[in-house]
């Protein structure tokens, strides 16, 4: 049973508004370069930024990815410096990169919880109950007796110089078959799902992008309370 942790305070170091940039479809490596550019500027006093976009189909691997979790057919994978394991990005999936200067003392787990809570809130607004699974990061649809727990949103971040990079991916109306070639997030005993698959109607990125932007900002600044549940596993580099 979850309790509610009061969070009337922002996790951000800056009180200035977050700049939200909706970029459409962007190549993964180009977006990664942009993240690093913005993060460097943020570390030097620039604004907090939330990038919202989609990627052309691509597999990316976090630092804990094992060889056997990669595509068996040798499909190329981009190795990244984020936490977590391997995942897929592609059309129909909303990717968010919050590049945020965290308040001291840094609480990276709390940051991840706030991202999770923002996406849990969006799913609830759409009529889909979701939550967390103990010991696993991300947002999940609960097992229903027929199907196992299913991940609908993945989270993988890195923190450098007190600034966050990478972020979350919410499956809206994407091709779930793309996850079949890998062990998504290194988890073998659970499934992957999307808003469209769960709700029985098409739920595209365009329908949720504004909701996600608002919820992420509300969660980061403490206007959405975070339920107290087991901590997400994250990695930080200073």
Swiss-Prot record:
Keywords in alphabetical order: Acyltransferase, Cytoplasm, Transferase
EC number(s) reported in the record: 2.3.1.181
Gene3D superfamilies per record: Bira Bifunctional Protein, Domain 2 (3.30.930.10)
Cysteine-cysteine disulfides: none
Coiled coil: none
Domain BPL/LPL catalytic: 44-224
Miscellaneous note of the record: In the reaction, the free carboxyl group of octanoic acid is attached via an amide linkage to the epsilon-amino group of a specific lysine residue of lipoyl domains of lipoate-dependent enzymes.
Name under which the protein is recorded: Octanoyltransferase
The organism of origin for this protein: Mycolicibacterium vanbaalenii (strain DSM 7251 / JCM 13017 / BCRC 16820 / KCTC 9966 / NRRL B-24157 / PYR-1) (Mycobacterium vanbaalenii)
